[in-house]
UniProtKB/Swiss-Prot annotation:
The keyword Ribonucleoprotein applies. Its main location: plastid. Gene3D superfamilies: 3.30.300.20, Ribosomal protein S3, C-terminal domain (3.30.1140.32). Residues 39-109 form the KH type-2 domain. The keyword Chloroplast applies. One of its GO terms (molecular function) is rRNA binding. Keywords: Chloroplast, Plastid, Ribonucleoprotein, Ribosomal protein, RNA-binding, rRNA-binding. This is Small ribosomal subunit protein uS3c. Belongs to the universal ribosomal protein uS3 family. Part of the 30S ribosomal subunit. One of its GO terms (cellular component) is cytosolic small ribosomal subunit. One of its GO terms (biological process) is translation.
Amino acid sequence: MGQKTHPLGFRIGITRDHKSSWFSNIKSYPKLAQEDYKIRSCIEKQLHNASISLIYIDRKVAQVQVHIHTARPGIILGKLGRGLEDLRKKLETTLKNDTQIRINLIEITDPDKEATLIAEFIVQRLEKRIAFRRVIRQAMQRAQKAKNQGIKIQVSGRLNGSEIARIESVREGRVPLQTLRAHIDYSYKTTHTIYGILGVKYGYLKEKK
C-alpha cells in the first residue's frame, strides 16, 4: 500500500518554515500547541470569507502576536476598523487566560500566487454546482498569470453528480514532489455538495528568483 507524504511537512527546515515561532518546556508544550490550534480554528471559522492564506503565531513571554496574511483585509477590519478589536477579544475569550494578543494584518498583493487561495476559489465554484472542468480551466488561467514553472490541480469525488467517484487531474509544466529543494506551494481543501464530499488538491512550483 502506497504511503503518502505531505509536500509541505516534508520540506520544513529546507524550503518551508513552521507556522508558529516559540519555545517551551515539556510540560507547557501540549497546552501551547492546543492554544495555537484554537487560535487558528477561531480565525478560520469567523473569517472564512476573508481569503486568508496563512496564520503565523509568534509567542513571547506573556504576549501572542498573530500575523494574518489576507487578500481582503477590509473584511477583517470591518466598519470603522472595529473588526480587529472584536477579533482580538474573541481570541482572548477563547483562550480563557491572561495572555495578551496582538493581531497584525499582512495584505497579499498577488492572490494568484497563493495555493490556499486558488484551492478556495475552486471549492467555492464547485459549491455553486459549476462544471468541474470549467472550474479547473478557470483556476489554471488564474495560476498561469503567476508565471510559475509548474501547476497541478486534482479534484476527486462524485464529479458532476456521477454515480461512481473518480479522480480528475490537470498538470502543466513540472511539479517535482520528490525534490526537496523544489519551492512547492500546496493546499488541500474539501467541500460538501449535494452529491457528497469533493476533495481539491492544488500545488505549483514557484518561479526561481
